[in-house]
Amino acid sequence: MTDLRNRDARRSRWLAAAIAADLLLVVMQAVACAMYRAPHTGDAQSYWELALYCAQNHTFYPSPRDEFALYIFGNGYVNLLSLLLRIRETYVWVYAVNMAFTQLLVFSVYRIMRRLCEGREAACAAVTLLCLLPALWGEAASSRTELCFMGLAFASLACAMEDGTGWHALSGVLMALCNWVRPLMVILLPMTLLLLILRKKRLRCIAAYLLGAAAVIATIGQATKSLSGHFIYQAQTMGVNMLMGNNDDADGSYDNTVFGEGKIGYISEDERGVTYQVRDAFYKRQAVDWIVRHIPRFVQLIPRKLFYFLSTDTYGGTPYLGGGTETDNLPYLLSLRDVLLGRGERGFAFGDAVVIFSQLIYMAVLALFALDIVSAFRRGTWVRMLPFWGIFALACGIAVLTVGAPRYHMPYLPIFAMGAGDYLLAGRGGAAEPDETV
């Protein structure tokens, strides 16, 4: 009787912690949106301008005018945002979309963990840790694809774990939609199929999943073909990223100089009229040729790329410094060191505290995730987490083929939180047990 009361009390504490963490997440996202005052730059600016153009001209992306763009990216996100901007041209839609998809992500992680583990303690632990990651806080203030993609991707995984062909068809639809936002189906599709197989789903469930995805791909591709003359379903940025990470001057992160005159990615002024498809194929070919000719150098870059990919998680602090200071680069981190040592040219700011907390909580969650992998093999429960580990492993492979950047690990933060939650409850002798269907 005492054990039952203790378990109920623990369950109540974890549930309260999850609710409190989610409320904190909502509040901190709202604060980030209110504090971001600087003009948006980079991808955020590009997505916004593309969506605004589509809204004002009653068209969709990509259109014929994009045929000679550097690349096509963020297709699904741009089109969603453009539809909302036709109602009213306000950046508030960005905040609303980001916060809505964040809540979809939180609920999806909870459902996944409930299916993986008996009881809700591990699910609440995973949600608590996920909501405490400031990467999710600050991202709400920018018109980027991360939160939209993550919400759709993990909703797809959650639906795949439910019973019934309708859920699996919906999972396929959501998977295709998330890939329309960000082209990572090459990672998610095989691991979702593995998840369905490990959970002993029938062939009709797998067929429903594939048909759901195929229906969305065909619909979007055909609609784009009628608009632009080309069957375009997903972004085409692989060539650019591969070449930035694989050239003579590559250091593991971005190297934009590879596109300059005299470099292997240079396209002369006389050839500026090439389409994004031709350009993408050219960049891929140049990158592959470089890898083949410089295999030892490519291998040497692997640790650097993975270091850039996983070592820091500080980009969420940018909005809390007004948006004008990027917090995911070495110059900022050096300036923060000087501030902490009393040598800085400015005082300690709220955004600095967010950055420090972000790095600390990220490293803690990542460490718990690593411990859970070891613990799962010891407990003999590794099979249930295998598809999620596979997603992360394939993501590392993509980083090795392209470039390593801190923001690129953001879509996999929920997997880190899930592993950490599992370790806290099951790996350390808690009550969480593997799902019987696995």
Positions of the model-derived regions?
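Transmembrane-helix motifs of polytopic, lipid-linked glycan transferases
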Residues: 93-117, 367-374
